[in-house]
Amino acid sequence: MHTEPVLTQCRLAGLPHLASGKVRDMFAVGDDLLVVTTDRLSAFDVVMANGIPWKGKVLNRLSEFWFRFLDVPNHLLTCDVDEMPATVRAHADILRDRAMLVRRAEPFPVECVARGYLIGSGWSDYQKTGAVCGITLPAGLRQAARLPEPIFTPATKAVTGHDENIGFDEMVAVVGRETAERLRALTLSIYTRGAAYAETKGLILADTKLEFGLVDGCITLIDEVLTPDSSRYWPAADYREGISPPSFDKQFVRDYLESIHFAKTPPGPTLPPDVVARTSEKYREAFRVLTGGGTIHALAR
């Protein structure tokens, strides 16, 4: 039986390491950037001690799928390790299916969030104020209700800890009105297209978080796109208003951490094998459903 290796730390001889996020490690490749998606998993903004098999490959290949599906400028050059420079190809066994060569961008210091359903922090905000990020919504909506139309709710980009929701006017103060309006339009367009496609696969795209930056002065989609880490997907068959529907992400991990009364501060605990296995299967299921089946390597080709 094949056992998928788990990658939680990545350092590559001959490639300068630039930075690491909760999941991704970045390396310099000339003027470009190599983004390696590891199998690390964070919950409640804390990285767990062990990784999730297949997670990094699923996130990387799904982002590639969406970059190619969406008709918007993006930073992707290639996900095919065999097309990358020799310094990268030297690490092909580690990098295949989990590495992306991209153009360097100057990121905007905001997260661009689109919400089509009332869930998560949006639901909490609505219960207190009747609005989400300053956007007033109809009275009497229930948890997980579909919104009359998708809304744009930007957030600050936190290096550590939680992103914080901000109003559109606050975003304007950070990036300028013209840029803010363009980012809002792009975000809502991408969400609408992604949600329509997901619907054909029996999924509801409840919300998503996108990042943009400037490449040669042009607004460009960067980072990850419409993955289970950046988006909330629900099986349409299980959707009900008034409850939080099951999602294709790390819910098993969050439920486990709540059951052990995790303090939500580092270090993260070691996840038990059953939680790891069920979480891995959720990520792989999302990949199979969204891409029409097949294996990671089939999509790579």
What are these regions (language model features)?
Residues 241, 245-273, 278:
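C-lobe/activation-segment region of protein kinase-like
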